Amino acid sequence: MRLRICFLMMFSAQVGAFDAGDMSKLNTGRECARCDLSQADLSDAALSGVDLKWASLTRTNLSGADLRGADLKWANLSGADLTHADLTGATLNGAHLWEARFLGARMRRVSLVGTDLKWANLAGEGFQGADLTLVNLSGADLRKTDLRSALLTKAKLVGANLQAANLAKANLTFANLSEANARKANFAGADLTSADLKWTNLGQANLSGARLTGADLSYTSLFKANLNGAEWARARFCKTTMPDGVINNAGCH
């Protein structure tokens, strides 16, 4: 990594992208809060446990980088390339991730509290056990994404594509999944207490053992969904398509 960074320090004088002093700081230690590393090539870099709070990493190449346990709170990663990076246990609370690429990245137990991931393409990615509290995933592509045991309390997933996603035992209390497409998704044992599921497609979804207490299922499709052992006390049903195709209007006013 040192040879790569030395080359980049010489190149930076020509392009004026990142700060050479900040690059040197990153090379000599694990603390680089508020550093400007914009457009730097840090592919395959060993950055586990590094402190990059508030750092500028716009359009930075972090593909294949080892960022396990890294502190990236409030960092600007807009347009950054994180393909195949290892972010296991990393903290990205409040980070700016507009147009960041995560293809093949390892995201287990990552913390993304309050981040904005609208329209992000995260299809097939692994977020098992991740903290996604208050995250905005509206319109995001989450097809076949692994969200088992993820914490999605008050998360915004309006219009998200969750087809065949795995949300088994995920915590989705007070989450907004209105208009989401969750056809064939796995919500087994998930907690959807007080979740907004209006106009959501849950056709053929697995909701066995799920908690739907107080959830709003108005205009929702549950056609051929598995509701074995699910709890739905105080849930609202209005023009809801039940698993057998019958329309439930019990909660219409």
Where in this protein do the model-derived segments appear?
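Absolute protein N-terminus
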Residues: 1, 17-18
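Sec-dependent signal peptide recognition
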Residues: 1-8
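Residue-level detector of intrinsically disordered terminal segments
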Residues: 8-9, 106
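N-terminal signal peptide c-region/cleavage motif recognized by signal peptidases
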Residues: 12-14
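Tandem repeat scaffolds
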Residues: 18-253
